[in-house]
Swiss-Prot record:
Organism: Tachypleus tridentatus (Japanese horseshoe crab)
Role played: Hemocyanins are copper-containing oxygen carriers occurring freely dissolved in the hemolymph of many mollusks and arthropods.
Protein name per UniProt: Hemocyanin alpha chain
Tissue expression per record: Hemolymph.
Family of this protein: Belongs to the tyrosinase family. Hemocyanin subfamily.
One Pfam family cited in the UniProt record for this chain: Hemocyanin_N
Quaternary structure and partners: Polymer that contains six different types of chains (alpha, beta, gamma, delta, epsilon, and zeta).
Domain of life per record: Eukaryota
Cellular component terms (Gene Ontology): extracellular region
Subcellular location, principal: secreted
Alphabetic keyword roster: Copper, Oxygen transport, Secreted, Transport
Subcellular location per the Swiss-Prot or TrEMBL entry: Secreted, Extracellular space
GO molecular function terms noted in the UniProt entry: oxygen carrier activity
Length: 87
């Protein structure tokens, strides 16, 4: 249901700035995410920096192209582990 989908997305925002307890090894990450994560966690993010904007745009395009909701959620969970929390 829509309510269940909303709840699963809302859970991604809990403890957003906390360091993840478990890291997904780079080999196990989805290949579509291999080109994001240049701006490491804890660094200042700003869309006024061209490199930051390009990375955020690329991440958006990856998430937007997800095959279905479950694929989208998987990509979000994996990206949350290593992508800058401001992004």
């Amino acid at each position: 249901t829509i309510k269940e989908k909303q709840a699963s997305i809302l859970a991604l925002f809990e403890h957003l700035t906390s360091v993840p307890k478990q890291h997904i090894p780079e080999k196990e990450r989805d290949n579509r995410l291999h080109d994001v994560g240049h701006l490491s966690r804890g660094k200042l993010f700003s869309l006024f920096h061209r490199e930051h904007l390009e990375e955020a745009t690329h991440l958006y395009e990856i998430l937007h192209a997800a095959k279905n909701f479950d694929d989208f959620l998987l990509l979000c969970k994996q990206a949350r582990d290593f992508v800058n929390e401001g992004m």
